[in-house]
Swiss-Prot record:
It comes from Arabidopsis thaliana (Mouse-ear cress). Residues 1-74 form a transit peptide. This is Phosphoglycerate kinase 2, chloroplastic. Mg(2+) binds at D431. It is an enzyme of class 2 (transferase). The modification Phosphoserine is found at S78. InterPro entries: Phosphoglycerate_kinase (IPR001576), Phosphoglycerate_kinase_CS (IPR015911), Phosphoglycerate_kinase_N (IPR015824), Phosphoglycerate_kinase_sf (IPR036043). Keywords: ATP-binding, Calvin cycle, Chloroplast, Kinase, Magnesium, Metal-binding, Nucleotide-binding, Phosphoprotein, Plastid, Transferase, Transit peptide. Disulfide bonds: none annotated. It is found in: Plastid, Chloroplast.
């Protein structure tokens, strides 16, 4: 058994006491206003939707009145910058992400992405635009009937309160005829854009054919913004203006704005199985955060890098030096880096495995760590209680197995508690989203990212082609 001092050393790695939590000179972002009538007109009712509707309303009011955007934003023009003069009678190509799951009977099992697209579409139709809606569904290889968008039409029509017309293709004479007959305030859903291989290849001729259907372009598909496809990047070369939809803008505001210029202290929670998959995120967040909490399978690489025994836990041997470098970088920057002090270990990787809680420094041979322990949860919670902004990406353990889900669930519940107290809580996509939904606290978080790979790449500081292609915004005072 390692000494108490050795165990304590795992808990907090920092330079000098208090340095991390006193960096408060950077500007914080503003208060979220109460839901307005104009926000409600955009079609929200649930808690999570009301938060989004407030955000949408702030985008509209920031341009039409004297209001300003609530957070520092990526400088891209938004659909909220447009009005009825810009939109009435105009054909607007809207790229949304309606890639929803369907069961064997083609029934939608989760309509979250459809509901997330409604504010932008509703804003456009209320301002007299003719909406030409484009999306992908699944990964079809050519025209594949089971990936047709037909099952989406009833739910879209219900949420919008109008009859959505569906085309049998996304380009060609028949589509052009439907576009020509589209009334102001009407919506035409094009068939799955990925039925054409030219979409993912971003072929200019295909992009030009898509663009020829419309007068201007709105990208509201954050989940595909990291891909340079014809409908996300190519069309912008032929359509002006090309602007961000409300959902895409909200993602940028939180994942770029709130993270780059947070209310402090700012904590980042990063989990997941491998250090290699989160290197970019960790390195980027070390430049911005005051507190960094690490969990998930990656922690065992950090433990081994410090000379600890990890039993048969997952370790990336080729990342031991990197782990040491990241620990040193955190210390040099005055970031409080917390590793779990205890872990839940198992004798096999299975939901029915035998398990027990041990200090992180005392994992026996033949056992593997599959979750953080209760002492770690307590330490993490105490650190999070000091924060004003928290971003979370990645589970604390194998939360698919109920026996090893407690750490992840504890983080989800803690963030829900903090959010209710006014702390900005950002769920950065992927498994963290599944975790807060499983626990039933998704509705109280400040922001839940709709992107998987796009969220990670944005947090890593990478350029997203679908965002870069959009028009620059007129400067707005923040």
């Amino acid at each position: 058994m390692a000494s108490t001092a050795a165990t304590a050393a795992l808990s907090i790695i920092k330079s000098t006491g208090g340095a991390a939590v006193t960096r408060s000179s950077r500007a914080s972002f503003g208060h979220i206003p109460s839901t307005s009538v104009s926000a409600r007109r955009l079609g929200f009712s649930a808690v999570v939707d009301s938060r989004f509707s407030v955000h949408v309303a702030s985008k509209v009011h920031s341009v039409r009145g004297k209001g300003a955007r609530g957070v520092i934003t990526m400088a891209k023009k938004s659909v909220g910058d447009l009005n009825s003069v810009d939109l009435k009678g105009k054909k607007v190509f809207v790229r949304a992400d309606l890639n929803v799951p369907l069961d064997d009977n083609q029934n939608i099992t989760d309509d979250t992405r459809i509901r997330a697209a409604i504010p932008t579409i509703k804003f456009l139709i209320e301002n007299g635009a003719k909406v030409i809606l484009s999306t992908h569904l699944g990964r079809p290889k050519g025209v594949t009937p089971k990936f047709s968008l037909a099952p989406l039409v009833p739910r879209l029509s219900e949420l919008l309160g109008i009859e959505v017309v569906k085309a049998d293709d996304c380009i060609g004479p028949e589509v052009e005829t439907l576009v020509a007959s589209l009334p102001e305030g009407g919506v035409l859903l094009l068939e799955n854009v990925r039925f054409y291989k030219e979409e993912e290849k971003n072929e200019p001729d295909f992009a030009k054919k898509l663009a020829s259907l419309a007068d201007l372009y709105v990208n509201d598909a954050f989940g595909t913004a990291h891909r340079a496809h014809a409908s996300t990047e190519g069309v912008t070369k032929f359509l002006k203006p090309s602007v961000a939809g409300f959902l895409l803008q909200k993602e940028l505001d939180y994942l770029v704005g709130a993270v780059s210029n947070p209310k402090r202290p700012f904590a980042a929670i990063v989990g997941g199985s491998k250090v290699s998959s989160k290197i970019g995120v960790i390195e980027s967040l070390l430049e911005k955060c005051d507190i960094l909490l690490l969990g998930g399978g990656m922690i065992f690489t950090f433990y081994k890098a410090q000379g600890l025994s990890v039993g048969s836990s997952l370790v990336e041997e080729d990342k031991l030096e990197l782990a040491t470098t990241l620990l040193a970088k955190a210390k040099a920057r005055g970031v409080s880096l917390l590793l779990p002090t205890d872990v839940v270990i198992a004798d096999k990787f299975a939901p029915d495995a035998n398990s027990k809680i041990v200090p992180a420094s005392a994992i026996p041979d033949g056992w593997m760590g599959l979750d953080i322990g209760p002492d770690s949860v307590k330490t993490f919670n105490e650190a999070l209680d000091t924060t004003q902004t928290v971003i979370w990406n990645g589970p604390m353990g194998v939360f698919e197995f109920e026996k090893f889900a407690k750490g992840t669930e504890a983080v989800a519940n803690k963030l829900a508690e903090l959010s209710k107290k006014g702390v900005t809580t950002i769920i950065g996509g992927g498994d963290s989203v599944a975790a807060v939904e499983k626990v039933g606290v998704a509705g109280v978080m400040s922001h839940i990212s709709t992107g998987g790979g796009a969220s990670l790449e944005l947090l890593e500081g990478k350029v997203l082609p679908g965002v870069v292609a959009l028009d620059e915004a007129t400067p707005v005072t923040v």
